[in-house]
A protein has these predicted regions:
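Juxtamembrane/disordered regions of integral membrane proteins
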Residues: 1-143
Length: 143
């Protein structure tokens, strides 16, 4: 449980930083929606899901896939209430789950859940392999 929480909060922290950077860029760029920034921010969030899995897989290298998937999903789950608070505080005409430009759409939430689980598993698998290799190297070396 501890590796999953560690990875989830690592990923959520990175997503928070990416979102703050995105908000700053949104204020600085005149036509944010038609620029390349939304794609860049989305890719950075995908990397954060991978880092969530990596953070969990480093601590629990024996079960990287389940640990990484749960850490990635946890990062997304921790971020959702924060995003709702941001929506509530901002003076914005967008609906939370309805309207033409809703903050959360069913498709968007589903895609993020799939990416969070998959990239969390990839990150944990990479970290787990690295840790197992390091541990095997330590046990094979003469003391």
């Amino acid at each position: 449980m501890r590796p999953v929480l560690r990875g989830a909060f690592l990923g959520a922290g990175l997503i928070f930083l990416v979102s703050v950077a995105g908000a700053l860029v949104d204020r600085a760029v005149d036509d944010f929606d038609d620029s390349g920034w939304p794609v860049t921010i989305f890719l950075a969030i995908l990397v954060a899901y991978g880092f969530a899995g990596w953070g969990a897989g480093r601590v629990a290298p024996t079960s990287p896939l389940s640990t990484g998937a749960l850490a990635g999903l946890g990062a997304f789950s921790v971020w959702v209430p924060v995003r709702v608070l941001i929506w509530a505080v901002r003076d914005d005409s967008r609906g939370l789950v309805s309207g033409d430009d809703a903050v959360f759409t069913l498709g968007g939430v589903f895609v993020n859940l799939v990416f969070a689980a998959a990239l969390g598993m990839v990150g944990a698998l990479l970290a787990g392999r690295r840790e197992r290799g390091r541990l095997a190297g330590e046990s094979a070396s003469p003391s």
